[in-house]
Amino acid sequence: MSERDGGITVLYKGGRLASWHRLSAAEKKAYEQEHVDLMLAVAQQHRLQRLEGFRLLAPQGDYERFWAIDFPSLEGAEAWIRAEMAPPYGRYGYYEYYLARSGLPEYCVAWAPQAGGLVPQTGDPREVPVLDVDRNSVVVVMFERGEVGQVAGDKPVTEEYVAEMGAFCQEHGLLRLERFQLIAPQAEWHHVWLAEFAAFESAEAWVQLERGPGHGCLSERSFALTRKWAPAYFAGWTYKEES
């Protein structure tokens, strides 16, 4: 498996509760600024390596965004979760957190180019701009578990599956492929995949191909179609060496 060197990933299903929208504009602004200042301090103290959000095209109740957050240590991940839920801002959020390790199985490493680092937005991240999605791509988030009786996280594949998916990814210009394996597997999913395409049609076709039984992976799956959430802004949150 091709793994990131050490480190831990926080996977976060999040959103805002309805009670947030009953606050005044002044309260929202004050709570948001306090929250941003706190989170940026945690990011710097614990050497945040990545903060990437994906907004669901169709929210599922209070669950609106999926996040992948990388730290070099468990201590950083724990500190981030505590800070994110801290009041007053934290009272108005929806939180589901999972700890994971990232790494692709060898059979699919060549399906997508190595992702390059995103150029952060210029300016002070404490000054939050108007945030929006990046409409230049669609990211499929796939939650998957093996069939009954398999070891958690295992995914047996056939040669036919590898050949078919590899050809599809090349034809449709797969931009990025990542996998995260949960440290504590859930009843319905053991790992998460991110597959990014430039075209919505390609993302939709990838979902249908993964759902097919032809590759012999009788796995339980659920999918969410997303767009990257203000990627250049949040790239500016990562740890910076002090000069």
Q: Where in this protein do the model-derived segments appear?
A:
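Conserved, mostly hydrophobic/aromatic
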Residues: 67
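A contiguous, mid-protein "functional segment" used to position or interact
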Residues: 207-211, 218
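Short S/T/G/P-rich N-terminal loop/turn motif that feeds into the first structured element of a domain
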Residues: 1-63, 71-78, 100-190, 196-208, ...
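Acidic-histidine catalytic/liganding microenvironments
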Residues: 45, 87, 213
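Conserved short beta-strand edge segments in small beta-sheet-based binding/regulatory domains
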Residues: 89-103, 215-227
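Solvent-exposed loop/turn segments connecting transmembrane beta-strands
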Residues: 86-87, 186
